[in-house]
């Protein structure tokens, strides 16, 4: 059994990790930390886990994280990089759901996250945790930077076209919408029901930290310079993400060839569903699952291709993806513990 610790288990990604790992057949949950909730049974905070998780929260100094096989960080940015060196020295693998190990460019990290990087030497060995595009590196990694939720949809939606060199990489547009759980569990006025309900707004249009992450990874993947206009939006639902990407075709391709490009790219991917051309995927079709669904459109048979991508921002966009990485790191089938059917209605 894989001994698992979770640092920061009181947020939405933390409880989502607990939900998934509680039924994972190869995992033994051994520690979950929270300074504020030290001693509180996990099931008291999250009654949904009664009978599944019998751990109590413990402060980090009591948690014996160095005795784990892997530690997940479901924490604010900056926490994992402070603790990772000690864990790695003890032979513990690290998966960070924040941004500490996503960007290779430390200057970009410091610009967008407003803090110095405390262990830049670890970035060279950190694997970016988007399994479908970086599987081999993740298998061999000691430390993984789990992708952001928006970058997951943007990269999987654009990668086949960029790798085939059939679109203008210098002018990509991503219009993305997320449920409010993407903002985390902290108390914040803009996330109150009376503020977020019955409302729809854009944010971060002049610059968002997920943009440099997406651009860096697409450039590493393709060797092309990438230009991206990214506009995120907050929608009045709890979980779910819908991303619409626009790109200009630079090569003559019919719709069947475009569809085949995506079907071939993801034919062996258990968590990527390429829907029939012209489909309209819905966020609810992925709720509480690790599935991501893609559909292509070509308005008026012109030179613009529209890529629609949906996922659950807390699962494939965060905790499910992290468990998918863990499975690879420990030589398990990557679907282990992740074959949940989406919840409807």
UniProtKB/Swiss-Prot annotation:
List of catalytic residues: 149
Listed EC numbers: 1.2.1.38
GO BP of this protein: L-arginine biosynthetic process
Chemical reaction(s) catalysed: N-acetyl-L-glutamate 5-semialdehyde + phosphate + NADP(+) = N-acetyl-L-glutamyl 5-phosphate + NADPH + H(+)
Pfam assignment, any one: Semialdhyde_dh
Gene3D superfamilies: Dihydrodipicolinate Reductase, domain 2 (3.30.360.10), NAD(P)-binding Rossmann-like Domain (3.40.50.720)
Keyword Cytoplasm: yes
Keyword Signal tagged: no
Family annotation (SMART domains): Semialdhyde_dh (SM00859)
PROSITE patterns tied to this protein: ARGC
HAMAP family registered for this protein in UniProt: ArgC_type1
Task performed by this protein: Catalyzes the NADPH-dependent reduction of N-acetyl-5-glutamyl phosphate to yield N-acetyl-L-glutamate 5-semialdehyde.
Family: Belongs to the NAGSA dehydrogenase family. Type 1 subfamily.
Protein name: N-acetyl-gamma-glutamyl-phosphate reductase
Source organism per UniProt: Herminiimonas arsenicoxydans
Lineage: Bacteria, Pseudomonadati, Pseudomonadota, Betaproteobacteria, Burkholderiales
């Amino acid at each position: 059994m894989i001994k698992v610790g979770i640092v920061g288990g009181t947020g939405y990604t933390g409880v989502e990790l607990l939900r998934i790992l509680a039924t994972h057949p190869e995992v033994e949950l051994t520690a979950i930390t929270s300074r504020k909730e030290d001693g509180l049974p996990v099931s008291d905070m999250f009654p949904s886990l009664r009978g599944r998780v019998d751990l109590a929260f413990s402060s980090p100094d009591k948690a014996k994280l160095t005795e784990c096989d892997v530690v997940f960080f479901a924490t604010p940015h900056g926490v994992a990089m402070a603790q990772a060196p000690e864990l790695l020295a003890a032979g513990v693998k690290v998966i960070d759901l924040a941004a500490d190990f996503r960007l290779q460019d430390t200057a970009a990290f410091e610009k967008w996250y407003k803090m110095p990087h405390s262990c830049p030497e670890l970035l060279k060995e950190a694997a970016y945790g988007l399994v479908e595009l970086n599987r081999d590196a993740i298998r061999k990694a000691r430390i993984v930077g789990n992708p952001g939720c928006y970058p997951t949809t943007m990269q999987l939606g654009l990668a086949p076209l960029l790798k085939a060199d059939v679109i203008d990489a210098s002018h990509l547009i991503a219009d993305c919408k997320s449920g409010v759980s993407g903002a985390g569990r902290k108390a914040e006025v803009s996330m109150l029901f009376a503020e977020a309900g019955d409302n729809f707004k854009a944010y971060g249009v002049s610059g968002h930290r997920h943009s440099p992450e997406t651009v860096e990874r697409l450039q590493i993947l393709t060797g092309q310079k990438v230009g991206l206009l990214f506009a995120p939006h907050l929608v009045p639902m709890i979980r779910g993400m819908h991303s619409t990407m626009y790109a200009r075709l630079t090569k003559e391709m019919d719709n069947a060839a475009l569809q085949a490009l995506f079907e071939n790219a993801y034919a062996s991917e258990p968590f990527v569903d390429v829907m029939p051309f012209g489909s309209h995927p819905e966020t609810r079709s992925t709720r509480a699952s690790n599935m991501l669904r893609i559909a292509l459109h070509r308005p008026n048979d012109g030179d613009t291709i529209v890529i629609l991508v949906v996922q659950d921002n807390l699962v494939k966009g965060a905790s499910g993806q992290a468990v998918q990485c863990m499975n690879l790191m420990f030589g398990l089938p990557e679907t282990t513990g992740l074959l949940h059917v989406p919840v409807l209605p």
